[in-house]
Amino acid sequence: THRELVEGVEAGKVDFAILPIENSIVGEVRDSIDLINKRNIYIVGEVKHKIEHNLLGIKGSKIDDIKRVYSHEQALMQCSEFLGKYPEWEKIRMNNTALSAKYIGDTGNKENACIANMETRKMYNLELLQPDVNNEKENFTRFFIVSNKNLICENSEKISVITSTKNEAGALMKLLKVFSDYGLNMVNLKSRPKTNKPWEYYFYIDFEGNLEEEKVEKALEEIREKSIYLQILGNYKVYNVEI
């Protein structure tokens, strides 16, 4: 699970982990954002992956056999138009698409299918029932590479922070104005509810820059003054490649 990955990195059991953070169709992967909040881990890179979903079953099965479809929640949402053609199918959430493929392979039940990629088809010797069941063909997911070491290279170009403001009129607006004042391009802003504090939120922000830049240093100083909490998650390079 994502939690196990993050906890493994934080404890030093693994050097790096890759977490999905946002999909181009259905938006943010909320549990990933919540998991990296207030943890001793850092974002050290970002990569983009083109998503191709396929309906897979066990060898010898046909679409007419299917009664249940297993996959990750995001994959089920990204294939909702195809799945909507089969309202009688039970849609069952799994921790990830690879686990769903392994599960149906282990059960050997022709009534079970999964949504996963072609690699899992080969890995678990599954039948391709329907290729490319995505709602949209141009379907991409951004992934963060995380580590318990704050690794920053000279050409790091993006910064991610989590912050929280006082619950008073204009507090968030004043904080966001800092980005404009220093000419920093904010490329992402998300609000997430605070644990055990109803109707209170923290904010996840991505912006372009390098921590060595003077304007970035000054902007973060002002943001810290205007917030009640600020965590710099990382300053990293974006790898515009498909993995």
Go through each PLM region and give its residues.
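Domain-level signature for soluble enzymes in the chorismate/prephenate branch of the shikimate pathway
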Residues: 1-243
